[in-house]
Amino acid sequence: MAAAAATPRLEAPEPMPSYAQMLQRSWASALAAAQGCGDCGWGLARRGLAEHAHLAAPELLLAVLCALGWTALRWAATTHIFRPLAKRCRLQPRDAARLPESAWKLLFYLACWSYCAYLLLGTSYPFFHDPPSVFYDWRSGMAVPWDIAVAYLLQGSFYCHSIYATVYMDSWRKDSVVMLVHHVVTLLLIASSYAFRYHNVGLLVFFLHDVSDVQLEFTKLNIYFKARGGAYHRLHGLVANLGCLSFCFCWFWFRLYWFPLKVLYATCHCSLQSVPDIPYYFFFNILLLLLMVMNIYWFLYIVAFAAKVLTGQMRELEDLREYDTLEAQTAKPCKAEKPLRNGLVKDKLF
């Protein structure tokens, strides 16, 4: 795998479009692509897969081994670090049970987002400031730069682990089924975009999605720690409130503003300008649009959360996502537990 960055262009980056421009140009490009595809069908799909998909068996094996490694590492961290920490800090039982999951996800998303931010903002890759450049010089079977390949290995193996973890390790929640769909779609996007060498746009998607998960898990940890050892800790409560506001803002800005205007505009419209016969155009854009739909779905939880706060129905941060079915049927919280109704709105991302 090569380490060379994308070839720089002398032209000034194209200004980011408005929502209306993005929708109009993307629809026109997609319609033209559909009308010009005379041989679209399973035959073309099979030929495109055979000619343009490059994913070696050793790469798949390495991803599976890393997924097993994530699972083992999470178990070890939960057993030897997170649970003893919760016990030492004298967290409420419900909070102590949820701390390992949030702590684990915070560490992963913080590390991966920091790495992706470094690649996009600290190196010569122009993809964040010039999203159409993700398709400049694209070639079928081109070498993947080693630093982007590392990001793909981390993310792909983690989402493979996350499918297992959602079913067998995480608390079951209202949107866990949607979360499973999200993980499957994300893993399919990661594997296929790597195979078809759309890794540049994948790096941008990683960056735009992981930042909100960092804030979510950090905020949830402060919610768990704000009432511990029989006392209320105002600092953690303040940080949780500020983190909630920051999370809501970043969710909209990164996933509902930048994601469609940078990523979807580049994949739906600009891709055909750079590579008129780009393979699997509709397949990838349908998956990315499905990801956008799920982002909007979770944003509805955020709106419901904000509405409860603004109307005074909620005096403490309450989890609109987290719930345990058995606990909901049997548990009756005591007075000391009421200020600890915790959580936020959503749990991750591509």
Swiss-Prot record:
Compartment list: Endoplasmic reticulum membrane
Q: What induces it?
A: Up-regulated in skeletal muscle in response to high-fat diet.
- Consequence of substituting H183D: Decreased ceramide synthase activity
Q: What is the effect of changing D213N?
A: Decreased ceramide synthase activity
Q: Where's the TLC domain?
A: 97-311
Q: What class of enzyme is it?
A: transferase
Alphabetical GO CC annotations of the entry are: endoplasmic reticulum; endoplasmic reticulum membrane; intracellular membrane-bounded organelle
Q: Which residues carry this modification: N-acetylalanine?
A: A2
Show the coiled coil region(s).
none
EC assignment: the record states: 2.3.1.299
The organism's place on the tree of life at top rank: Eukaryota
Question: Can you cite a GO biological process for this protein?
Answer: ceramide biosynthetic process
**Reaction equations catalysed:** a sphingoid base + octadecanoyl-CoA = an N-octadecanoyl-sphingoid base + CoA + H(+); sphinganine + octadecanoyl-CoA = N-(octadecanoyl)-sphinganine + CoA + H(+); hexadecasphinganine + octadecanoyl-CoA = N-octadecanoylhexadecasphinganine + CoA + H(+); sphing-4-enine + octadecanoyl-CoA = N-octadecanoylsphing-4-enine + CoA + H(+)
Q: Which Pfam families does its entry note?
A: TRAM_LAG1_CLN8
GO function terms (MF aspect): N-acyltransferase activity; sphingosine N-acyltransferase activity
Residue ranges of the TM segments: 53-73, 103-123, 148-168, 176-196, 239-259, 287-307
Tell me the impact of changing H182D.
Decreased ceramide synthase activity
Membrane topology field: Multi-pass membrane protein
Give expression by tissue: Expressed in brain, skeletal muscle, heart and perigonadal white adipose tissue.
What's the further remark here? This protein is produced by a bicistronic gene which also produces the GDF1 protein from a non-overlapping reading frame.
Q: What does this protein do?
A: Ceramide synthase that catalyzes the transfer of the acyl chain from acyl-CoA to a sphingoid base, with high selectivity toward stearoyl-CoA (octadecanoyl-CoA; C18:0-CoA). N-acylates sphinganine and sphingosine bases to form dihydroceramides and ceramides in de novo synthesis and salvage pathways, respectively. Plays a predominant role in skeletal muscle in regulating C18 ceramide and dihydroceramide levels with an impact on whole-body glucose metabolism and insulin sensitivity.
Q: Under what name is this protein listed?
A: Ceramide synthase 1
